[in-house]
Amino acid sequence: MSYNCCSGNFSSRSFGGYLHYPGCNPYSTALCSPSICQLGSSLYRNCQKTCWEPTSCRKSCYRRRTSMLCSPCQTTCSRSLGFGSSSCHSQGYGSRSCYSLGSGSSGFRFLKYGGCGFPSLSYGSRFCYPNYLASRAWQSSCYRPICGSRFYQFTC
């Protein structure tokens, strides 16, 4: 699974597909190269950087937490997911994630991670978001975005 941040494409062999982020400059590879955005075990060695904001290719730092049973990721926030929304998420054991999805949406939608499993959504969706489980393997959780989302549809 990898993020090609500055090209605006999200790819994953786990479910085979692309998520397109409109407005991302494909020529800004100097700001966020695919090698920096690679997801995997190397992400949790010391403090590396990855990209959660494809439009501007902002780099966010993830620190290793040995006390966490699941993802050692700290809370990160991203903007410009393709339709003018914002997203804040905190990955970790029993953590909570909140999303603001859809054009013109002003509120956050809360979802809970059951332990280190897949989060549940009350409004259902089909866009996939990587989830780091206790098995230390990257897997994808499926969401269905609310009306107005430009995310591509996947079957996960």
From Swiss-Prot:
InterPro entries: KRTAP_PMG (IPR007951), TNFR/NGFR_Cys_rich_reg (IPR001368)
Pfam family for this entry, one: PMG
Family: Belongs to the PMG family.
Gene: KRTAP13-4
Region (4 X 10 AA approximate repeats): 37-82
Subunit structure: Interacts with hair keratins.
Function comment: In the hair cortex, hair keratin intermediate filaments are embedded in an interfilamentous matrix, consisting of hair keratin-associated proteins (KRTAP), which are essential for the formation of a rigid and resistant hair shaft through their extensive disulfide bond cross-linking with abundant cysteine residues of hair keratins. The matrix proteins include the high-sulfur and high-glycine-tyrosine keratins.
Any single Gene Ontology cellular-component annotation: cytosol
Organism: Sapajus apella (Brown-capped capuchin)
Sequence repeat residue numbers: 37-46, 47-56, 57-66, 73-82
Protein name: Keratin-associated protein 13-4
Keyword match Repeat: yes
Sorted UniProt keywords: Keratin, Repeat
